[in-house]
Amino acid sequence: FDLELGVRVAGERVSLVPPLLRLLREQPDLLGVVRGLEDSQTFPVALDARRILPVPAGRLKAWLLPLLEFLDEDRPRLSRHNAAALAGLDDLPTQWIGGEELRDLGRRLRDFSGMTRYEPASGFTATLRPYQQIGLDWLQFLREYGLAGILADDMGLGKTVQTLAHLHLEKTSGRADRPSLVVATTSLMANWRDEAAQFTPDLKVLILHGKDRAERFGEIGQADLVLTTYPLLVRDRETLLAQDWHLLVMDEAQFIKNPKAQAHQVARSLQARHRLSLTGTPLENHLGELWAQFDFLMPGLLGNAKRFTQVFRTPIEKLGEEEMRTRLGERVRPFL
């Protein structure tokens, strides 16, 4: 979808996106200036060389925040993962034209209204606790809309069993017509193997580990679930990159928090319909780690690294801007 902000001036429909983007590029402190105005005050926006439009500061504040993330584009394009960014604009007296599906998704991401309950499929042998059931519903919600996320429950609260319930439901529904890949630390290989055998015994599990693992590469296409480790993800990248996956899961996903590391780059290059990260610590040291997680999951959600630093990281970490902290929280909350 294209993002346009149209107003009528003397009967002519004029797009405010180009002049607002131009203003933001020319005046980096524009948002701060506008924030200092009362909502009822107006701010002059030059539409062209001849026309200046006074825009209410209240509307301008709401419009500028989403546009900050599109400064590198002359014509902003919205994808599904940008839907949450539109939620605040619904509060304005705005007439929307088109994009209803995207706006509806934005509202659902805002409060998760209408999230369907998905019972574990027959053959899944665990009994999910209430919060684990909510986790399964959320994973299915993300899958339904082609989104990705971070399951960030604390250690011991069942991230593995929730993921297995999701994988099993995908397989029994017929949606998983290709294998899924879990990348985890070496210490977690046995846990994944044992819990899969206990809770999803009808899933075909293939462990790619050990010196003889290359002998089992030919079995990847027949497996439902393939398990490997972060070091082997890099070593076996040629084989793993050649396979199309249904679900790609990064367990202990803090291991790909460095976007320059080979593990992150290989993981980002893998072809998968759906992606999921499991970690109890999505953010350990700085906001750049959070950006790296979402760069793997949904590239573009938080812009490129340079734009993320300009829009979010510097204002939050160095300037202590609570409004941008809130904005970032609202942006990632549906996916975390």
Question: Where would I find each of the regions flagged by the language model?
Answer:
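ASCE P-loop NTPase motor core, strongest for the SF2 helicase catalytic module
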Residues: 95-336
